[in-house]
From Swiss-Prot:
This is DNA gyrase subunit B. It comes from Staphylococcus epidermidis (strain ATCC 35984 / DSM 28319 / BCRC 17069 / CCUG 31568 / BM 3577 / RP62A). The record marks 459, 462 as: Interaction with DNA. The keyword Cytoplasm applies. InterPro entries: DNA_gyrase_B_C (IPR002288), GyrB (IPR011557), HATPase_C_sf (IPR036890), Ribosomal_Su5_D2-typ_SF (IPR020568), Ribsml_uS5_D2-typ_fold_subgr (IPR014721), Topo_IIA (IPR001241), Topo_IIA-like_dom_sf (IPR013760), Topo_IIA_B (IPR000565). Belongs to the type II topoisomerase GyrB family. Few gyrases are as efficient as E.coli at forming negative supercoils. Not all organisms have 2 type II topoisomerases; in organisms with a single type II topoisomerase this enzyme also has to decatenate newly replicated chromosomes.
């Protein structure tokens, strides 16, 4: 702990007077989901982020440079920073030490008065007190004023008054807590990779801060430390690592206006997909918002203006749409705001209207100057946009074919689609089934009220290597777009989704895995909001059927099969049938094993790490063979090959 703490420095009048109290903490244990989203694995990890966010705030204020997160034995978490240390003097309104108020009163903290912190990262803004309320045990150690202060809590209740336990020449705060099993009934075990990915993201978004993660649960301690002086510029470098950049360095801007801090990094590559990540106060704004709007608006306007004045765009027909200017773009937009307003289904859309104009103005001034100072790069970017524009015009006719006016519009549906009778998207499912024969079985075995079937013939186009015009000329892709009802590209609208479960159902062999990967690549590159909303699933058809007398067992993998063999009596003799494809199962078997909501097992496709997802699709489906070969060699030991 001591290593992460800072030598005594100026605490800048950060004291109890800056800690404001808004309301009590009684409801937190009764309704934890209101405060941390859920009590699932995701909610468990959210506890860590609430504490880490406070340390990030201290770093953004200029008082901390190192944050350490440790998963201790028995899944205790310890978060230490080398900031000023939480104030320990008496908070006037409550008559208790400020650190105790922060840890026991909801919405008490330096972020609410405006005088303590300029920016607060926490999505819910509830912080330490909620973590305390939802922890079986929590301990705080404050190094401040040359003294170490300590207090312990159980389920949010102080066990003794704040006490002095020693002298120190450091400053900082360490909080240890253990999540309460009464609240987190699903699991209290932390996933190292989940913590690692978010910590790496936070290090990119807060340049210069070092964040270390340690796992002490096993004998061999695992440790990763992240520190990026380049910040989001380094982020873009990593995202484009497996791509072919069109210019050497990412274009970078970091400026403030009207107390809004704007940081943008972008670089074009030779590909066709757009990878635009936006953040507000370190929160990934999956649904976009005003900062994204301002960036897109400025990008389109500046490129058209520059292209026209430089005589690269010579005709009106070559004017660029927003979609054209973003082809092959990798960009990260990050803003910091003293009072962010979040909206949208998942509270991940920035709503502050003033941000749009600030981002637009700061970015357009910088970007325009860059283009005129680097005309060769400007020409490459504009010419790429013109090519995209011509491809878009070529795709227009094909796009019209995919339009479905509404969920009730059946006249435009693909002929092969066996639609469901329900018009309620929340209960409707569509199964994308490999092959016509399997499609026939699934049509016979489904619940026709809520389950639609769309058979796919053969492998769809690899969209990683294709422009939108070519993609829209692919029959299987066109049928999917029409069936889903959302549109594609710039016209994509998730509110028009006809089904809230889109289920990929392929054979359990290598071809099936390839088709599954092609479909996931398409969803990730052109319909990513479907994944982000949790609408995309992978069916789990059985690989084996084991029969013993009149008893049948369906088994989904080799490990389950081995376990079942050991558990069953050798008599009566049993037989094993291996399903090579969905077409080998009759309608009743498909319903019983794979489609019946009462018994089926499905995997929900989730996007937790934009960097890993982007690099994985680029590696598996892109042009660089060497990277793919290396991946196969590294992972061959885990593969279940089917010859």
């Amino acid at each position: 702990m001591v290593n992460t703490l800072s030598d005594v420095n100026n605490t800048d009048n950060y004291g109890a007077g800056q800690i404001q109290v808004l309301e009590g903490l009684e409801a937190v244990r009764k309704r934890p989901g209101m405060y941390i989203g859920s009590t699932s694995e995701r909610g468990l990890h959210h506890l860590v982020w609430e504490i880490v966010d406070n340390s990030i705030d201290e770093a953004l204020a200029g008082y901390a440079s190192h944050i350490e997160v440790v998963i201790e034995k028995d899944n205790w978490i310890k978060v230490t920073d080398n900031g000023r240390g939480i104030p320990v003097d008496i908070q006037e309104k409550m008559g208790r030490p400020a650190v105790e108020v922060i840890l026991t009163v909801l919405h008490a903290g330096g972020k609410f008065g405006g005088g303590g912190y300029k920016v607060s990262g926490g999505l819910h803004g509830v912080g330490s007190s909620v973590v305390n309320a939802l922890s079986q045990d929590l301990e705080v150690y404050v190094h401040r004023n040359g003294t170490i202060y300590h207090q312990a809590y159980k389920q949010g209740v102080p066990q003794f008054d704040l006490k002095e336990i020693g002298d120190t020449d450091k400053t900082g705060t360490a909080i240890r807590f253990k999540a309460d099993k009464e609240i987190f009934t699903e699991t209290t075990v932390y996933n190292y990779e989940t913590l690692q990915k978010r910590i790496r993201e936070l290090a990119f978004l807060n340049k210069g801060i070092q964040i270390t993660l340690k796992d002490e649960r096993e004998e061999e301690v695992r440790e990763d430390s992240y520190h990026y002086e380049g910040g989001i510029k380094s982020y873009v470098d990593l995202l484009n690592e497996n791509k072919e950049p069109l210019h050497d360095e990412p274009i970078y801007i970091h400026q403030s206006k009207d107390d809004i801090e704007v940081e943008i990094a972008l670089q074009y590559n030779s590909g066709y997909a757009t990878n635009l990540l936006t953040y507000a106060n370190n929160i990934h704004t999956y649904e976009g918002g005003t900062h994204e709007d301002g960036f897109k608006r400025a990008l389109t306007r500046v490129l058209n203006s520059y292209g026209t004045q430089s005589k690269i765009i010579k005709e009106d027909k070559d004017r660029l749409s927003g979609e054209d200017t973003r082809e092959g773009l990798t960009a990260v937009v990050s803003i910091k705001h003293g009072d962010p307003q979040f909206e949208g289904q998942t509270k991940t859309k920035l709503g502050n209207s003033e941000v749009r104009q600030v981002v637009d103005r700061l970015f357009s001034e910088h970007f325009e100057r860059f283009l005129y100072e680097n005309p060769s790069v400007g020409r490459i970017i504009v010419e790429k946009g013109i090519m995209a524009s011509r491809a878009r015009v070529a795709a227009k006719k094909a796009r019209e074919v995919t339009r479905r006016k509404s969920a009730l519009d059946v006249s435009s549906l693909p002929g092969k689609l066996a639609d469901c009778s329900s018009k309620n998207p929340e209960e409707s499912e569509i199964f994308l089934v490999e092959g016509d024969s399997a499609g026939g079985s699934t049509k016979s075995g489904r619940d026709s009220r809520t389950q639609a079937i769309l058979p796919l013939r053969g492998k769809i186009l690899n969209v990683e290597k294709a422009r939108l015009d070519r993609i829209l000329n692919n029959n299987e892709i066109r049928q999917m777009i029409t069936a889903f009802g959302t549109g594609i590209g710039g016209e994509f609208d998730i509110s028009k989704a006809r089904y809230h479960k889109i289920v990929i159902m392929t054979d359990a062999d290598v071809d099936g895995a390839h088709i599954r990967t092609l479909l996931l690549t398409f969803f990730y590159r052109f319909m990513r909001p479907l994944i982000e909303a949790g609408y995309v699933y992978i069916a789990q058809p059985p690989l084996y059927k084991l029969t013993q007398g009149k008893q049948k067992y369906y088994v989904f993998n080799d490990r389950e099969l081995d376990k079942l063999k050991q558990e069953l009596n050798p008599s009566p003799k049993w037989s094993i049938a291996r399903y090579k494809g969905l077409g080998e199962m009759n309608a009743d078997q498909l319903w019983e094993t794979t489609m019946n909501p009462e018994h089926r097992s499905m995997l929900q496709v989730r996007l937790e790490d934009a960097i890993d997802a982007d690099q994985t699709f680029e590696m598996l489906m892109g042009d660089v063979v060497e990277n793919r070969r290396q991946f196969i060699e590294d992972n061959a030991v885990y593969a279940n090959l089917d010859f």
